[in-house]
């Protein structure tokens, strides 16, 4: 059904792009395995992915995925068993991921930069039987070995699946860049040997349904012990279809999309919005194994005709500040999506100046597969909001009593839609606490729905600072600090104060490397913020703690301050 409603409770429907339905088919029987099968049938000779300048077609991707399935079946795995992937964006990742899903197994994505403790928790909590790990991180597996319950590790190399050039890539990684620390692991198999082992068997098709589990996507690691969000095939397919409906209104049926996948595929945003979305379109994704290697990153995208890119605020800021990035040909760039953390107006302005395209902010969480909101793709300027709820998605703003507040009023953002997770893995109490009595997922984010239907985020509830009874949202203060011409990055936290309960404290990274004048910065803030929001102290740092995706870790700054 196309939107033509003047729905006062859902004002966003009146602002949908032409042709975008207010509902998708929520009863589709399609699975992620079907996405790959369709791509193999319809786009067999099209490039599916590119790594280190070498491309893999959809036909080749399907063939390798079936071999991965066969290998796991020969190891004795059954439908529903969990398989962990611990690697960055290398060619083997999509092949292994699709292979796991084709077999009816469940993908457990693990951040390759995790410590042995974090790896052990996620492996044992999920019950993963097999781990595919890039050899660069095998030493972490060795450290965790005594505590791990997994049966086997398959060792992947960065050059796997890219032919002759792969040998060169592997040699450079191991012997020139020395990226591989020594390790010794029992019960391991090189990925190339695993594929040879698989070829000795026969692929057995598995019946997969929309209510089967696809991913255990762990979340909450920046605020506490990570818990696994259960994402079913229907959750992910719904989100991919929601994204496709939004794109179709803007780009029609264009069939030559090239997505630059710079965010790691173990992160839900890149997984859905880059890898799976692009497979549905029959496009090609350019895999960036290390987006922090900016010279190599920019060199790669200079050689591509990118039409789409997904970034986080810190990555957009770093790229737009580089002279070599300013030399990239952006003439084919249709849009750039920003998500994963708050996008700052100063960064969006700089991005537009460099690329000629606005940053289009979206919003979501691991628990929502992840896209819940996105701005229209035809905007000319950054809106400052996170967009409109996508098709079949309802957002309700609730007060601390669980009551829905009026349009324009602030409260907790609660989401209902087919992309919302089934619950947390083996944590019924956490699951129950995370949903309202009428079935909305409680995000823990504070925001509002404006009169025009645009959703605006204030901050995380747990990050909100209470100064003399007044709410201060770190995002707002960080945005003001980031507008200063010499501030590259900013982070704001609350610290205990005997007079006001809490006080605002800021940390900044300067562009020129010099220490920022504390009073000068407070004057800057006073011009743009009411008094209780102005930081009591502003400290210059060489860098700020971040997750591998680039999200600033306020918790680490708070912990450091509390330790004294």
Where are these regions (language model features)?
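AMP-dependent adenylate-forming
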Residues: 10-17, 34-57
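Conserved AMP-binding/adenylate-forming core of the ANL superfamily
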Residues: 28, 45-90, 94-98, 115-120
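A short helix-loop-beta submotif of the ANL/AMP-binding
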Residues: 46, 82, 88-116, 124-130, ...
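Conserved adenylate-forming
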Residues: 72-77, 198-211, 216-261, 283
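AMP-binding/adenylate-forming catalytic core of the ANL superfamily
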Residues: 114, 131-135, 309, 401, ...
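ANL superfamily adenylate-forming
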Residues: 142-210
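Conserved AMP-binding/adenylation subdomain of ANL enzymes
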Residues: 237-258, 268-308, 322
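Gly/Ser/Thr-rich phosphate-binding loop
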Residues: 303-310, 320-381, 394
């Amino acid at each position: 059904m196309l939107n033509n409603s003047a729905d006062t409770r859902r004002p966003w429907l009146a602002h949908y792009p032409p042709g975008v339905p207010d509902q998708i088919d929520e009863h589709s029987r399609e699975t992620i395995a079907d996405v790959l099968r369709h791509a193999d049938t319809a786009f067999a000779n099209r490039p599916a992915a590119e790594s280190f300048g070498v491309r893999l077609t959809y036909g080749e991707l399907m063939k390798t995925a079936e071999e991965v399935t066969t290998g796991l079946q020969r190891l004795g795995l059954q439908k529903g068993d969990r398989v962990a992937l611990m690697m960055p964006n290398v060619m083997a990742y999509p092949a292994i991921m699709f292979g796991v899903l084709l077999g009816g197994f469940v993908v457990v994505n693990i951040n390759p930069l995790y410590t042995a403790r974090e790896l052990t928790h996620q492996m044992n909590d999920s019950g993963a039987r097999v781990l595919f790990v890039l050899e660069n991180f095998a030493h972490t597996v060795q450290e965790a070995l005594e505590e791990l319950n997994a049966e086997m590790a398959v060792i992947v190399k960065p050059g796997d699946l890219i032919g002759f050039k792969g040998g060169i890539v592997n040699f450079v990684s191991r012997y020139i860049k020395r990226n591989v620390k020594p390790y010794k692991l029992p019960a391991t198999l090189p990925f190339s040997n695993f594929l040879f082992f698989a070829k000795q068997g026969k692929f057995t098709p598995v019946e997969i349904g929309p209510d089967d589990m696809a991913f255990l996507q762990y979340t909450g690691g920046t605020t506490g012990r990570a818990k696994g969000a259960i994402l079913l095939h229907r959750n992910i397919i719904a989100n991919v279809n929601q994204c496709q409906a939004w794109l179709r209104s803007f780009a029609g049926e264009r069939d030559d999309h090239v997505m630059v996948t710079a965010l790691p595929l173990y992160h839900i945003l890149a997984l859905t919005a880059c890898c799976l979305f692009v497979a549905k379109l029959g496009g090609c994704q350019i895999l960036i194994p290390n987006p922090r290697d900016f010279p190599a990153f920019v060199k790669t995208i200079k050689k591509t005709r990118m039409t789409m890119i997904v970034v986080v605020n810190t990555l957009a800021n770093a790229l737009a500040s580089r002279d070599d990035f300013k030399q990239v040909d952006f003439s084919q760039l249709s849009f750039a999506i920003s998500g994963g953390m708050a996008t700052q107006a100063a960064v969006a302005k700089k991005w537009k100046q460099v690329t000629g395209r606005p940053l289009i902010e979206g919003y979501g969480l691991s628990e929502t597969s992840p896209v819940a909101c996105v701005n229209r793709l035809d905007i000319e300027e950054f809106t400052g909001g996170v967009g409109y709820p996508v098709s079949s998605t309802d957002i309700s703003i609730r007060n601390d009593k669980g009551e829905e507040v009026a349009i324009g009023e602030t409260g907790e953002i609660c989401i209902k839609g087919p992309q919302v997770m089934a619950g947390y893995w083996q944590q019924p109490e956490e699951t129950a606490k995370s949903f309202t009595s009428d079935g909305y997922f409680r995000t823990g984010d504070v925001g509002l729905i404006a009169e025009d239907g645009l959703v605006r985020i204030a901050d995380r509830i747990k990050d909100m600072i209470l100064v003399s009874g007044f709410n201060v949202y770190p995002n707002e203060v960080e945005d003001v600090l980031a507008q200063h011409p010499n501030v590259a990055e900013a982070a704001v936290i609350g610290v205990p104060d005997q007079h006001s309960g809490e006080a605002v404290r800021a940390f900044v990274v300067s562009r020129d490397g010099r220490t920022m004048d504390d009073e000068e910065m407070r004057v800057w803030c006073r011009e743009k913020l009411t008094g209780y929001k102005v930081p009591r102290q502003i400290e210059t740092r060489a860098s700020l703690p971040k997750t591998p995706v680039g999200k600033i870790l306020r918790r680490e700054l708070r912990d450091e301050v509390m330790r004294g």
